[in-house]
Amino acid sequence: MTQIFNFSAGPAMLPVEVLRRAEQELCNWNGLGTSVMEISHRSKEFMQVAAESEQNLRDLLKIPSNYKVLFCHGGARAQFAAVPLNLLGERSTADYIDGGYWAHSAVNEAEKYCTPNVIDVKTRVDGLRGVKPMREWQLSDDAAFVHYCPNETIDGIAIEEEPDFGDKIVVADYSSSILSRRIDVSRYGVIYAGAQKNIGPAGLTLVIVRDDLLGKARRELPSILDYQILADNDSMFNTPPTFAWYLSGMVFKWLKEHGGLAEMEKRNQEKADLLYSAIDGNDFYRNDVAVANRSRMNVPFLLADAALDKVFLEESVAAGLHALKGHRVVGGMRASIYNAMPLEGVKALTEFMADFARRHG
Protein backbone atom coordinates (compact mmCIF):
# COMPACT_ATOMS: atom_id res chain seq x y z
CA MET A 1 0.00 0.00 0.00
CA THR A 2 1.25 3.48 -0.88
CA GLN A 3 2.16 5.51 2.20
CA ILE A 4 -0.41 8.24 2.75
CA PHE A 5 0.57 11.77 3.68
CA ASN A 6 -2.38 13.88 4.80
CA PHE A 7 -2.03 17.60 4.05
CA SER A 8 -5.47 18.52 5.41
CA ALA A 9 -5.81 21.89 7.13
CA GLY A 10 -7.91 20.31 9.86
CA PRO A 11 -8.84 17.87 11.13
CA ALA A 12 -5.24 17.19 10.34
CA MET A 13 -2.57 14.53 10.40
CA LEU A 14 -1.69 13.07 13.81
CA PRO A 15 1.67 11.51 14.74
CA VAL A 16 1.74 7.89 13.60
CA GLU A 17 3.22 6.78 16.92
CA VAL A 18 0.29 8.34 18.77
CA LEU A 19 -2.28 6.67 16.53
CA ARG A 20 -0.63 3.28 16.92
CA ARG A 21 -0.56 3.54 20.68
CA ALA A 22 -4.20 4.67 20.75
CA GLU A 23 -5.08 1.69 18.56
CA GLN A 24 -3.33 -0.68 20.96
CA GLU A 25 -5.09 0.81 23.98
CA LEU A 26 -8.50 1.36 22.41
CA CYS A 27 -10.38 -1.57 23.96
CA ASN A 28 -8.31 -2.05 27.09
CA TRP A 29 -6.96 1.22 28.37
CA ASN A 30 -4.62 1.25 31.35
CA GLY A 31 -5.48 -2.37 32.11
CA LEU A 32 -9.07 -1.49 33.01
CA GLY A 33 -10.64 -3.75 30.39
CA THR A 34 -12.57 -0.81 28.92
CA SER A 35 -11.84 2.00 26.50
CA VAL A 36 -10.74 5.41 27.72
CA MET A 37 -13.85 6.64 25.89
CA GLU A 38 -16.03 4.70 28.34
CA ILE A 39 -14.67 5.75 31.72
CA SER A 40 -15.99 8.60 33.83
CA HIS A 41 -14.33 11.95 33.38
CA ARG A 42 -14.34 12.19 37.18
CA SER A 43 -12.64 8.84 37.75
CA LYS A 44 -9.17 8.91 39.31
CA GLU A 45 -7.79 7.35 36.12
CA PHE A 46 -9.06 10.10 33.86
CA MET A 47 -8.20 12.80 36.38
CA GLN A 48 -4.62 11.58 36.06
CA VAL A 49 -4.85 11.90 32.25
CA ALA A 50 -6.13 15.46 32.67
CA ALA A 51 -3.42 16.43 35.15
CA GLU A 52 -0.60 14.96 33.07
CA SER A 53 -1.92 16.60 29.91
CA GLU A 54 -2.01 20.02 31.53
CA GLN A 55 1.44 19.66 33.07
CA ASN A 56 3.00 18.54 29.79
CA LEU A 57 1.39 21.46 27.98
CA ARG A 58 2.66 23.83 30.65
CA ASP A 59 6.15 22.38 30.26
CA LEU A 60 6.09 22.70 26.47
CA LEU A 61 4.90 26.30 26.39
CA LYS A 62 6.54 27.31 29.67
CA ILE A 63 3.20 28.65 30.87
CA PRO A 64 3.63 30.88 33.96
CA SER A 65 1.93 29.86 37.19
CA ASN A 66 -0.46 32.84 37.06
CA TYR A 67 -2.26 31.40 34.03
CA LYS A 68 -5.07 28.86 33.96
CA VAL A 69 -5.26 26.18 31.27
CA LEU A 70 -8.79 25.26 30.21
CA PHE A 71 -9.85 22.30 28.09
CA CYS A 72 -13.12 23.33 26.44
CA HIS A 73 -15.79 22.51 23.88
CA GLY A 74 -16.88 24.56 20.90
CA GLY A 75 -13.81 25.20 18.79
CA ALA A 76 -12.32 28.60 18.05
CA ARG A 77 -15.67 29.89 16.82
CA ALA A 78 -17.08 29.53 20.33
CA GLN A 79 -14.14 31.59 21.56
CA PHE A 80 -15.04 34.33 19.09
CA ALA A 81 -18.02 34.92 21.41
CA ALA A 82 -16.40 33.86 24.68
CA VAL A 83 -13.53 36.35 24.42
CA PRO A 84 -15.57 39.58 24.29
CA LEU A 85 -18.15 38.33 26.79
CA ASN A 86 -15.41 37.36 29.26
CA LEU A 87 -13.14 40.37 28.80
CA LEU A 88 -15.16 43.46 27.84
CA GLY A 89 -16.41 44.20 31.34
CA GLU A 90 -17.99 47.66 31.27
CA ARG A 91 -16.20 48.68 28.08
CA SER A 92 -17.91 48.80 24.72
CA THR A 93 -15.03 48.37 22.28
CA ALA A 94 -11.99 46.23 21.58
CA ASP A 95 -9.27 46.36 18.94
CA TYR A 96 -9.58 43.63 16.31
CA ILE A 97 -6.66 43.16 13.94
CA ASP A 98 -7.97 42.10 10.53
CA GLY A 99 -5.22 40.15 8.79
CA GLY A 100 -7.27 37.52 6.99
CA TYR A 101 -10.31 35.28 6.85
CA TRP A 102 -10.32 33.95 10.41
CA ALA A 103 -9.42 37.25 12.02
CA HIS A 104 -12.35 38.80 10.17
CA SER A 105 -14.64 35.98 11.30
CA ALA A 106 -13.82 36.92 14.89
CA VAL A 107 -14.83 40.50 14.08
CA ASN A 108 -18.19 39.36 12.72
CA GLU A 109 -18.98 37.55 15.97
CA ALA A 110 -17.71 40.35 18.20
CA GLU A 111 -20.08 42.82 16.54
CA LYS A 112 -22.93 41.11 18.41
CA TYR A 113 -21.47 42.16 21.76
CA CYS A 114 -19.52 45.37 21.21
CA THR A 115 -18.36 47.89 18.65
CA PRO A 116 -15.04 46.49 17.44
CA ASN A 117 -12.34 48.87 16.34
CA VAL A 118 -11.31 46.99 13.21
CA ILE A 119 -7.72 47.60 12.18
CA ASP A 120 -7.05 46.36 8.66
CA VAL A 121 -3.37 45.38 8.56
CA LYS A 122 -3.42 43.69 5.16
CA THR A 123 -0.99 45.21 2.69
CA ARG A 124 0.91 44.57 -0.54
CA VAL A 125 4.66 44.10 -0.74
CA ASP A 126 5.96 44.18 -4.31
CA GLY A 127 2.56 42.96 -5.45
CA LEU A 128 2.46 40.15 -2.90
CA ARG A 129 0.02 39.85 0.00
CA GLY A 130 1.41 40.69 3.42
CA VAL A 131 0.68 42.16 6.84
CA LYS A 132 1.86 45.46 8.27
CA PRO A 133 4.41 45.18 11.10
CA MET A 134 3.02 45.56 14.61
CA ARG A 135 4.63 48.97 15.08
CA GLU A 136 2.21 50.29 12.43
CA TRP A 137 -0.93 48.94 14.09
CA GLN A 138 -3.03 51.92 15.18
CA LEU A 139 -4.44 50.70 18.49
CA SER A 140 -7.05 52.67 20.39
CA ASP A 141 -6.74 53.91 23.97
CA ASP A 142 -10.12 52.71 25.24
CA ALA A 143 -10.10 49.14 23.90
CA ALA A 144 -10.73 46.36 26.40
CA PHE A 145 -8.26 44.13 24.57
CA VAL A 146 -6.41 43.55 21.29
CA HIS A 147 -7.37 40.45 19.30
CA TYR A 148 -5.39 38.96 16.42
CA CYS A 149 -4.75 35.69 14.58
CA PRO A 150 -1.03 34.86 14.18
CA ASN A 151 -1.58 32.32 11.40
CA GLU A 152 -4.26 32.39 8.71
CA THR A 153 -4.81 28.87 7.38
CA ILE A 154 -6.73 29.93 4.29
CA ASP A 155 -4.53 32.81 3.19
CA GLY A 156 -1.26 31.17 4.21
CA ILE A 157 -0.27 34.38 5.99
CA ALA A 158 1.60 34.41 9.29
CA ILE A 159 2.49 37.10 11.82
CA GLU A 160 5.72 35.90 13.40
CA GLU A 161 6.24 38.97 15.61
CA GLU A 162 5.27 38.64 19.24
CA PRO A 163 3.17 41.47 20.69
CA ASP A 164 4.73 44.19 22.80
CA PHE A 165 1.90 46.60 23.54
CA GLY A 166 2.70 47.58 27.11
CA ASP A 167 -0.15 46.91 29.51
CA LYS A 168 -2.73 46.16 26.81
CA ILE A 169 -4.48 42.79 27.06
CA VAL A 170 -3.55 40.75 24.00
CA VAL A 171 -5.76 37.88 22.83
CA ALA A 172 -4.49 35.51 20.14
CA ASP A 173 -6.19 32.81 18.10
CA TYR A 174 -3.37 30.27 17.83
CA SER A 175 -5.55 27.50 16.40
CA SER A 176 -3.27 26.66 13.48
CA SER A 177 0.17 27.42 14.91
CA ILE A 178 0.01 26.48 18.58
CA LEU A 179 2.99 24.31 19.59
CA SER A 180 4.71 24.83 16.22
CA ARG A 181 7.28 27.21 17.70
CA ARG A 182 8.31 28.80 20.96
CA ILE A 183 6.28 31.78 22.18
CA ASP A 184 6.35 33.94 25.28
CA VAL A 185 3.00 33.23 26.92
CA SER A 186 3.48 36.12 29.36
CA ARG A 187 2.96 38.58 26.49
CA TYR A 188 -0.68 37.46 26.16
CA GLY A 189 -3.78 37.78 28.27
CA VAL A 190 -5.59 34.95 26.50
CA ILE A 191 -4.43 32.34 24.00
CA TYR A 192 -6.97 29.98 22.48
CA ALA A 193 -6.69 27.20 19.93
CA GLY A 194 -8.91 24.57 18.39
CA ALA A 195 -7.14 21.23 18.76
CA GLN A 196 -7.87 19.79 15.33
CA LYS A 197 -4.98 21.36 13.46
CA ASN A 198 -1.77 21.04 15.45
CA ILE A 199 -2.75 19.22 18.64
CA GLY A 200 -5.26 16.39 18.36
CA PRO A 201 -8.70 15.42 17.10
CA ALA A 202 -11.59 17.82 16.65
CA GLY A 203 -13.80 18.52 19.65
CA LEU A 204 -11.31 20.03 22.09
CA THR A 205 -10.36 23.69 22.46
CA LEU A 206 -7.50 25.00 24.58
CA VAL A 207 -7.75 28.30 26.42
CA ILE A 208 -4.82 29.77 28.34
CA VAL A 209 -5.98 32.74 30.40
CA ARG A 210 -4.18 35.00 32.87
CA ASP A 211 -5.61 34.83 36.39
CA ASP A 212 -6.40 38.53 36.71
CA LEU A 213 -8.76 38.31 33.71
CA LEU A 214 -11.06 35.81 35.40
CA GLY A 215 -14.32 36.85 37.02
CA LYS A 216 -15.12 39.72 34.66
CA ALA A 217 -17.71 37.97 32.50
CA ARG A 218 -20.90 39.68 31.47
CA ARG A 219 -24.05 38.32 33.05
CA GLU A 220 -25.47 37.09 29.74
CA LEU A 221 -22.45 34.87 29.04
CA PRO A 222 -23.45 31.17 28.95
CA SER A 223 -21.89 29.35 31.89
CA ILE A 224 -20.17 26.84 29.61
CA LEU A 225 -18.11 29.70 28.11
CA ASP A 226 -17.32 31.44 31.41
CA TYR A 227 -13.57 31.18 32.04
CA GLN A 228 -14.02 31.58 35.81
CA ILE A 229 -16.55 28.75 36.01
CA LEU A 230 -14.42 26.49 33.84
CA ALA A 231 -11.34 27.24 35.94
CA ASP A 232 -13.19 26.66 39.22
CA ASN A 233 -14.35 23.27 37.92
CA ASP A 234 -11.01 22.15 36.43
CA SER A 235 -12.56 22.23 32.93
CA MET A 236 -15.22 19.75 34.07
CA PHE A 237 -18.24 22.00 34.55
CA ASN A 238 -19.90 19.54 32.18
CA THR A 239 -18.60 16.35 30.58
CA PRO A 240 -15.53 17.30 28.55
CA PRO A 241 -14.51 15.68 25.22
CA THR A 242 -12.55 12.98 27.01
CA PHE A 243 -11.19 11.05 24.03
CA ALA A 244 -9.93 14.22 22.35
CA TRP A 245 -8.37 15.27 25.66
CA TYR A 246 -6.67 11.87 26.04
CA LEU A 247 -5.29 11.91 22.49
CA SER A 248 -4.12 15.50 22.80
CA GLY A 249 -2.32 14.52 25.98
CA MET A 250 -0.56 11.78 24.05
CA VAL A 251 0.52 14.35 21.46
CA PHE A 252 1.95 16.55 24.23
CA LYS A 253 4.03 13.58 25.41
CA TRP A 254 5.12 12.91 21.82
CA LEU A 255 6.25 16.50 21.45
CA LYS A 256 8.34 16.31 24.62
CA GLU A 257 9.88 13.02 23.52
CA HIS A 258 10.83 14.59 20.18
CA GLY A 259 12.68 17.58 21.56
CA GLY A 260 9.92 20.00 22.47
CA LEU A 261 9.08 23.22 20.69
CA ALA A 262 12.65 24.17 19.82
CA GLU A 263 12.94 20.99 17.77
CA MET A 264 9.46 21.44 16.26
CA GLU A 265 10.37 24.97 15.22
CA LYS A 266 13.51 23.69 13.51
CA ARG A 267 11.67 20.87 11.72
CA ASN A 268 8.81 23.11 10.64
CA GLN A 269 11.19 25.68 9.19
CA GLU A 270 13.01 22.96 7.26
CA LYS A 271 9.77 21.61 5.81
CA ALA A 272 8.50 25.06 4.87
CA ASP A 273 11.81 26.05 3.27
CA LEU A 274 11.78 22.90 1.16
CA LEU A 275 8.23 23.45 -0.07
CA TYR A 276 8.59 27.17 -0.78
CA SER A 277 11.84 26.49 -2.65
CA ALA A 278 10.01 23.99 -4.85
CA ILE A 279 7.32 26.59 -5.59
CA ASP A 280 9.66 29.52 -6.16
CA GLY A 281 12.06 27.48 -8.27
CA ASN A 282 9.49 26.44 -10.85
CA ASP A 283 7.46 28.83 -13.01
CA PHE A 284 4.70 26.24 -13.08
CA TYR A 285 3.78 27.12 -9.46
CA ARG A 286 3.15 30.38 -7.66
CA ASN A 287 2.67 31.57 -4.09
CA ASP A 288 1.52 35.18 -3.73
CA VAL A 289 2.42 35.83 -0.08
CA ALA A 290 5.31 38.14 0.84
CA VAL A 291 8.28 36.18 2.17
CA ALA A 292 8.16 37.85 5.60
CA ASN A 293 4.57 36.69 6.10
CA ARG A 294 4.69 33.21 4.62
CA SER A 295 3.13 30.63 6.90
CA ARG A 296 5.18 27.65 8.01
CA MET A 297 1.99 25.71 8.67
CA ASN A 298 -0.22 26.32 5.63
CA VAL A 299 1.30 26.76 2.19
CA PRO A 300 -1.12 27.76 -0.59
CA PHE A 301 0.02 27.67 -4.20
CA LEU A 302 -1.47 28.10 -7.66
CA LEU A 303 -0.74 26.20 -10.85
CA ALA A 304 0.19 28.11 -14.00
CA ASP A 305 -2.94 26.71 -15.63
CA ALA A 306 -5.97 26.39 -13.34
CA ALA A 307 -7.50 23.96 -15.84
CA LEU A 308 -4.98 21.42 -14.53
CA ASP A 309 -6.14 21.69 -10.91
CA LYS A 310 -8.43 18.68 -11.14
CA VAL A 311 -5.73 16.55 -12.76
CA PHE A 312 -3.21 17.62 -10.11
CA LEU A 313 -5.56 16.59 -7.33
CA GLU A 314 -6.41 13.25 -8.92
CA GLU A 315 -2.78 12.37 -9.54
CA SER A 316 -1.64 13.54 -6.11
CA VAL A 317 -4.18 11.30 -4.37
CA ALA A 318 -3.00 8.37 -6.49
CA ALA A 319 0.53 9.17 -5.30
CA GLY A 320 -0.55 9.06 -1.65
CA LEU A 321 -0.66 12.84 -1.19
CA HIS A 322 -4.09 13.65 0.20
CA ALA A 323 -6.15 16.78 0.92
CA LEU A 324 -4.21 19.28 -1.20
CA LYS A 325 -7.23 21.14 -2.53
CA GLY A 326 -7.14 24.82 -1.61
CA HIS A 327 -9.90 26.51 0.35
CA ARG A 328 -12.87 27.59 -1.73
CA VAL A 329 -12.16 31.24 -0.88
CA VAL A 330 -8.77 31.29 -2.63
CA GLY A 331 -8.79 28.15 -4.81
CA GLY A 332 -5.66 26.45 -6.07
CA MET A 333 -3.78 24.10 -3.76
CA ARG A 334 -2.83 24.17 -0.11
CA ALA A 335 -0.42 21.97 1.80
CA SER A 336 -0.80 22.04 5.57
CA ILE A 337 2.42 20.83 7.15
CA TYR A 338 1.79 20.83 10.88
CA ASN A 339 4.02 19.20 13.50
CA ALA A 340 2.89 15.67 12.66
CA MET A 341 3.84 15.95 8.98
CA PRO A 342 7.28 14.35 8.57
CA LEU A 343 9.94 15.81 6.31
CA GLU A 344 9.51 12.72 4.13
CA GLY A 345 5.96 13.81 3.36
CA VAL A 346 7.07 17.21 2.14
CA LYS A 347 9.86 15.64 0.10
CA ALA A 348 7.31 13.32 -1.52
CA LEU A 349 5.12 16.31 -2.35
CA THR A 350 7.94 18.36 -3.89
CA GLU A 351 9.08 15.41 -5.98
CA PHE A 352 5.53 14.91 -7.22
CA MET A 353 5.22 18.62 -8.02
CA ALA A 354 8.43 18.59 -10.05
CA ASP A 355 7.32 15.52 -11.98
CA PHE A 356 3.84 16.96 -12.59
CA ALA A 357 5.33 20.20 -13.91
CA ARG A 358 7.61 18.28 -16.30
CA ARG A 359 4.69 16.30 -17.68
CA HIS A 360 2.16 19.13 -17.92
CA GLY A 361 4.25 22.27 -18.23
Swiss-Prot record:
Keywords: Amino-acid biosynthesis, Aminotransferase, Cytoplasm, Pyridoxal phosphate, Pyridoxine biosynthesis, Serine biosynthesis, Transferase. L-glutamate binds at residue 42. Pyridoxal 5'-phosphate binds at residues 76-77, 102, 153, 173, 196, 238-239. GO terms for biological process: L-serine biosynthetic process; pyridoxine biosynthetic process. Its cofactor is pyridoxal 5'-phosphate. Its EC number is 2.6.1.52. GO terms for molecular function: O-phospho-L-serine:2-oxoglutarate aminotransferase activity; pyridoxal phosphate binding. The modification N6-(pyridoxal phosphate)lysine is found at residue 197. It is found in: Cytoplasm. InterPro entries: Aminotrans_V_dom (IPR000192), Aminotrans_V_PyrdxlP_BS (IPR020578), Pser_aminoTfrase (IPR022278), PyrdxlP-dep_Trfase (IPR015424), PyrdxlP-dep_Trfase_major (IPR015421), PyrdxlP-dep_Trfase_small (IPR015422). It catalyses: O-phospho-L-serine + 2-oxoglutarate = 3-phosphooxypyruvate + L-glutamate; 4-(phosphooxy)-L-threonine + 2-oxoglutarate = (R)-3-hydroxy-2-oxo-4-phosphooxybutanoate + L-glutamate. Pathway: Amino-acid biosynthesis; L-serine biosynthesis; L-serine from 3-phospho-D-glycerate: step 2/3; Cofactor biosynthesis; pyridoxine 5'-phosphate biosynthesis; pyridoxine 5'-phosphate from D-erythrose 4-phosphate: step 3/5. Binds 1 pyridoxal phosphate per subunit. GO terms for cellular component: cytoplasm. PANTHER family: PHOSPHOSERINE AMINOTRANSFERASE (PTHR43247:SF1). Belongs to the class-V pyridoxal-phosphate-dependent aminotransferase family. SerC subfamily. Homodimer. Catalyzes the reversible conversion of 3-phosphohydroxypyruvate to phosphoserine and of 3-hydroxy-2-oxo-4-phosphonooxybutanoate to phosphohydroxythreonine. This is Phosphoserine aminotransferase. It comes from Pectobacterium carotovorum subsp. carotovorum (strain PC1).
